[in-house]
Regions:
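AMP-dependent adenylate-forming
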Residues: 12-21, 39-62, 406
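Conserved AMP-binding/adenylate-forming core of the ANL superfamily
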Residues: 28-32, 49-95, 99, 120-125
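Conserved adenylate-forming
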Residues: 77-82, 149-157, 163-207, 227-229
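AMP-binding/adenylate-forming catalytic core of the ANL superfamily
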Residues: 119, 254, 359, 364-365, ...
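Conserved AMP-binding/adenylation subdomain of ANL enzymes
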Residues: 183-204, 212-252, 267
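Gly/Ser/Thr-rich phosphate-binding loop
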Residues: 226, 251-256, 267-328, 341
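Conserved ATP/PPi-binding loop(s) of AMP-dependent carboxylate-activating enzymes
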Residues: 335-339, 347-376, 411-413
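AMP-binding/adenylate-forming catalytic domain of the ANL superfamily
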Residues: 472-492, 513
Length: 513
């Protein structure tokens, strides 16, 4: 097998102390807890009376209450026949019940299977069958309840959860997430943000994205449990409750997708909401316009901002763009995380190749998919499917998904580049770029554009003129479809381009070339 050399870390500013490499060359954090259960146990010991979990318009639990309730769920699962390593599917909505189900599964020594409740029924049925779930936690049934139980001998390399990918093509695949995967991501979040554990109990984090996705679960909920901070869960996103909760719950940590920030900042009375408590704003999941970064900084003047990039297969964060770099490098997803190695597979003359990722955050493979595992996780490297370049500073620039690159008569057009240009065009709130079949060129460039206002007609010529100032002619869309309804995205904020290709009626081209 060909040896792959990691790309130099460049100017990456993150702390890499207390790490080591195994015989395969994979880096690890040296002093992690042995499992999520031990991490949770330590926080309950140190901060039993600290507020742990708040469901907006629902229950509030301290860490001791959270442990006691989760231990009873674990006891109920064990009484129902769930054993170590069995899968427990979680179909509960976001809130206290979901968290108790997830933590109770961990305390039982079982494997959590968070299910995307937005999946169509055939997809849900597939996940339940493929995972071999022994028990399914459903909203219409009470949580399991029994004598308190907490597994005490779990190992760091044991399977802790199976997160099913959002399935932008075909049925989803189950990413096998170990305790080390979870714990490594927690440590990474602390290091890339420069968080002092002593400040943990003062943190109040609002989760506005799904808990069944790694951003909500791994990078927010579990990080706060590690710190002894408070997790506030918004059961469903609506912009007014989102803003009210920031104020009412004194939220100081936000992590969400760009579309949510854009919607919140577009509220005419945003200035009436006192958001001065917010000291950290994270974003990711989709490209972000430079203008939106500036608006976020202006709206949250006390906050450090940053862009996180990762996949279900990396347990969330693989790279991070910190505050000091966030304004001048909005086209970058940042530097490799402290224990993450990056490489480019078969880069072209422009330095663009498939992004390869290696680290203790990379999952153990796909459940029940040995061929897909061998193909995607070859030689300890995750083949991400993202096309990227890495500059001399070590900053990663994701230019497209490999399957979304448009080949226009032999010219490669990276859809993300065009989408970024569209994001700053007048009257454009959101945009997606896809290939449109063409008999002569093979593909032409098509853009689906969401108008910023339903009251004002979007000027397509003005948008094209804007693009001409920054893009080569062959990259400017020949087809533009304007709509007012939001674009379809998966729970991680990524565009569902297959649906857009299938559902968009393009009409006549807006330009001839």
């Amino acid at each position: 097998m060909t040896t792959i050399d990691p790309h130099p870390r460049g100017a990456a500013p993150f702390d890499t102390s207390g790490t080591f490499r195994d015989e395969q060359g994979v880096a690890h954090y040296a002093d992690l807890p042995s499992s999520l259960v031990e991490m949770f146990r330590a926080t309950v010991r140190d901060h039993p009376g600290q507020e742990a979990l708040v469901e907006v318009d629902g229950e509030r639990l301290t860490y001791q209450q959270l442990w006691d309730r989760a231990a009873r769920v674990a006891g109920g699962l064990r009484a129902a026949g769930v054993e170590r390593g069995d899968r427990v599917a979680n179909l509960l909505p976001a809130g206290v019940g979901w968290v108790l189900g997830f933590l109770g599964t961990q305390l039982a020594g079982a494997v959590a299977v968070p299910v995307n409740i937005r999946f169509a029924q055939p997809e849900i049925d597939y996940v339940l069958a493929d995972s071999g779930a022994k028990t399914v936690l459903r909203p219409e049934a009470p949580l399991p309840d029994g004598e308190p139980y907490a597994a005490g001998d779990l190992q760091i390399d044991e399977l802790a959860a199976i997160f099913y990918t959002s399935g932008t093509t075909g049925f989803p695949k189950g990413a096998m997430t170990t305790h080390e995967n979870f714990l490594s991501n927690v440590e990474t979040v602390l290091r890339v943000h420069g968080i002092d554990r002593a400040e943990g109990p003062r943190q109040r984090n609002l989760i506005s994205v799904p808990l069944f996705h790694v951003t909500g679960c791994n990078t927010q909920l579990l990080v706060q449990i590690a710190l002894g901070g408070t997790t506030v869960v918004l059961p469903a996103f609506h912009v007014r409750p989102f803003l009210r909760t920031i104020v009412d719950e004194r939220i100081n940590v936000l992590t969400s997708v760009p579309a949510i920030y854009a919607l919140a900042l577009s509220q005419p009375d945003f200035a009436d909401f006192d958001v001065r408590a917010v000291t950290r704003v994270g974003y990711g999941g989709s490209p972000i316009a430079p203008s939106l970064v500036e608006r976020i900084k202006a709206a949250f003047p006390q906050a450090r901002v940053g862009n996180g990039f990762g996949l279900t297969e990396t347990s969330s964060i693989a790279t991070y763009l910190p505050h000091e770099w966030a304004t001048e490098h909005t086209d970058s997803v940042g530097f490799a995380a402290p224990v993450v190695d990056l490489a480019l597979h078969e880069p072209d003359s422009a330095g663009v190749g498939e992004l390869l990722i290696r680290g203790p955050n990379v999952v153990a493979g796909y459940w029940n998919k040995p061929e897909a595992t061998d193909r995607t996780f070859a030689g300890s490297w995750l083949h991400s499917g993202d096309l990227a370049r890495i500059d001399e500073d070590g900053l990663v620039h994701v230019v497209d998904r490999a399957k979304d690159m448009i080949n226009r008569g032999g010219e490669n057009v990276y859809s993300v580049e065009v989408e970024n240009a569209l994001a700053s065009a007048p009257g454009v709130a959101d945009a997606a770029v896809v290939g449109v079949p063409d008999d002569v060129l093979g593909e032409k460039v098509g853009a689906v554009v969401v108008a910023a206002s339903e009251d004002e007609r979007l000027s397509v010529p003005a948008v094209l003129d804007h693009l001409a100032a920054s893009l080569a002619d062959f990259k400017i869309p020949q087809y533009v479809h304007v709509r007012t309804e939001p674009l379809q995205r998966n729970p991680g904020g990524k565009l569902l381009k297959r649906q857009l290709r299938e559902q968009t009626a393009w009409g006549a081209p807006v330009r001839g070339r």
